[in-house]
Each structure stands twice: as structure tokens, then as C-alpha cells.
């Protein structure tokens, strides 16, 4: 699959998340404290709330609706009410841009 240009690296603050819509899908793009970038599905697996409105801390994203918790580096569901993992996508940076490989 081709790499898709999602945003500039500076569009995402350290330890933060932004929403990225591509086609008919919504994704969440993250930047960790060590400046690594990650991408997951953008909607919580519990009630389809936008994760970009959630709180990011220590490589985790907290859903803004019911406080479910995911590890955004691997998509693992960490705290109820979420029990289904998030899908993750490969990310790389190139020439100041964040690129995502979608399936």
C-alpha cells in the first residue's frame, strides 16, 4: 500500500493527538514525548467517540466520553469500558511530513 501524506510534523504538539480524516474514515495521529508518531483508528471502540478529543498522557489516550483507555503505540485496550483494541497503522516521517500506510 502507498504511504499517504497526513500532515506536517509540527501540526501535532508533543504528547498530543489530532484528528485526520482520509476518504470516508477517521484516524487519530499522535506524537509522543520522544517525538515518535503513531496512528490509530480515530473512533473509540466502545461508543464511536472521536479520540482526538481525548486526553493523551504517557503513550495512552483516554476516551473523552467514558474514560476508557488505550495504549496508542499498539492499540491495546487498557481500561473499561473499552475491551476491543484499536487498529494501528504504520507511520514514518519524511521531509517534515507525517506519512501513514493504510490498508
Name these PLM-found stretches.
Residues 1-22:
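Zn-dependent metallo-beta-lactamase
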Residues 16-103:
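Rieske [2Fe-2S] iron-sulfur-binding domain
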Amino acid at each position: 500500500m502507498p504511504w499517504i501524506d497526513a500532515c506536517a510534523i509540527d501540526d501535532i504538539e508533543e504528547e498530543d493527538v489530532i484528528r485526520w480524516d482520509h476518504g470516508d474514515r477517521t484516524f487519530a495521529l499522535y506524537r509522543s514525548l520522544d517525538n515518535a508518531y503513531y496512528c490509530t483508528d480515530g473512533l473509540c471502540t466502545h461508543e464511536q467517540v472521536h479520540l482526538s478529543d481525548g486526553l493523551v498522557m504517557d503513550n495512552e489516550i483516554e476516551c473523552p466520553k467514558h474514560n476508557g483507555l488505550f495504549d496508542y503505540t499498539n492499540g491495546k485496550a487498557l481500561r473499561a469500558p473499552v475491551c476491543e483494541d484499536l487498529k494501528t497503522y504504520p507511520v514514518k516521517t519524511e521531509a517534515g511530513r507525517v506519512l501513514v500506510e493504510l490498508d
